[in-house]
Amino acid sequence: MSYACPILSTINICLPYLKDINMIDKRGETLLHKAVRYNKQSLVSLLLESGSDVNIRSNNGYTCIAIAINESRNIELLKMLLCHKPTLDCVIDSLREISNIVDNYYAIKQCIKYAMIIDDCTSSKIPESISQRYNDYIDLCNQELNEMKKIMVGGNTMFSLIFTDHGAKIIHRYANNPELREYYELKQNKIYVEAYDIISDAIVKHDRIHKTIESVDDNTYISNLPYTIKYKIFEQQ
């Protein structure tokens, strides 16, 4: 991998040998800050996968998220950072640092959308200038999330199945649940539309597990086990 910036090329070569991937320079910036600033998407991905902390603030209070919005103006970089689950404080601080709340409307909406998942009281923590301008969007986020929290699927809420680590591990088990199917088929969300992709993937996984179970030869040790046990065996694959 080659970069126009010599510093970044050196980082790429030395990365496997670094003792602390989150080391900071005299400006309080990490390698991740610099990779985001220089718009190096592949390097940002590598740093995140290697354990870079997305929550670290520089000496001037800048987060990587704020840099992605104000300097890089790169939505894909922003999405990568949000996928690595920054803290609510990090996101709120990043919103405070946004220099143009009009032109950066899409990036701001991405941050609000993520923050509302973490804490449904987020709206009270968002900078007033942003909360006033994006009030309708915040309300719609709340509406969709509250609806997910009301729907029970087995012993879980739709929200927990979609947005928690535990839910991600078990949602496929509920692929034929009538409440989940109805929610999926209605497709009423305008903001959290990724919920439908998650459910679709869960249905595909469930069907694959079921077909695998059906393909097991009769009169074998596994074939004689209860269906639920066989399901748990094959869902690990």
Curated annotation (Swiss-Prot):
SUPFAM superfamilies: Ankyrin repeat. PANTHER family: CYCLIN-DEPENDENT KINASE INHIBITOR 2C-RELATED, POLY [ADP-RIBOSE] POLYMERASE TANKYRASE. ANK repeats lie at residues 27-56, 60-90. It comes from the Viruses. InterPro entries: Ank_repeat_dom-contain_49, Ankyrin_rpt, Ankyrin_rpt-contain_sf, PRANC_domain. PROSITE patterns: ANK_REP_REGION, ANK_REPEAT. May be involved in virus-host protein interaction through the ankyrin repeats. This is Ankyrin repeat protein 14. Keywords: ANK repeat, Early protein, Repeat. Coiled coil: none annotated.
